Structures are given as C-alpha cells and as structure tokens.
Swiss-Prot record:
Keywords: Ribonucleoprotein, Ribosomal protein, RNA-binding, rRNA-binding. Belongs to the bacterial ribosomal protein bS18 family. The gene is rpsR. This is Small ribosomal subunit protein bS18. Binds as a heterodimer with protein bS6 to the central domain of the 16S rRNA, where it helps stabilize the platform of the 30S subunit. Part of the 30S ribosomal subunit. Forms a tight heterodimer with protein bS6. HAMAP family: Ribosomal_bS18. It holds the Pfam family Ribosomal_S18. It comes from Shewanella sediminis (strain HAW-EB3). GO terms for cellular component: cytosolic small ribosomal subunit. Gene3D superfamilies: Ribosomal protein S18 (4.10.640.10).
Amino acid sequence: MARYFRRRKFCRFTAEGVTEIDYKDIVTLKNYITESGKIVPSRITGTNAKYQRQLARAIKRARYLSLLPYTDLHQ
C-alpha cells in the first residue's frame, strides 16, 4: 500500500517577513477566502495564529469597505 505524502504547510507571511497584513491588498486576501466568501481556517492554509487573526481582521475590514464581497452566492 502506498502512503499518501502530504506537503508540509507553512506560513507564507512568516516566510516573507510580513509585519502587518494590509486590508487593501485584495489579491492576497482573495487567496484566503472560499468561493462562497468564508475565511479559510489556518489548519487548511498553515497560517500562524498571529497572522490568522490579522488576516481575519483585514478580510472583515475589506468586506466592510466593499473591497471584498460578503458572499458570492447572489442569484
């Protein structure tokens, strides 16, 4: 039986040396929300707790300012 090898998750923000996640950086924030608009949990993305809190805050600010949609499921 072959064992499935899962690539080790790492925090992209720690690797790049980011000090603060900017709510105006929509391209980066879109990588951390699902198609339905939910914030992706850190156990999936591998983001550290410190940056996950900053990420959630930045996404919520961007949503409030209409830079990001709350949901994409409008029909």
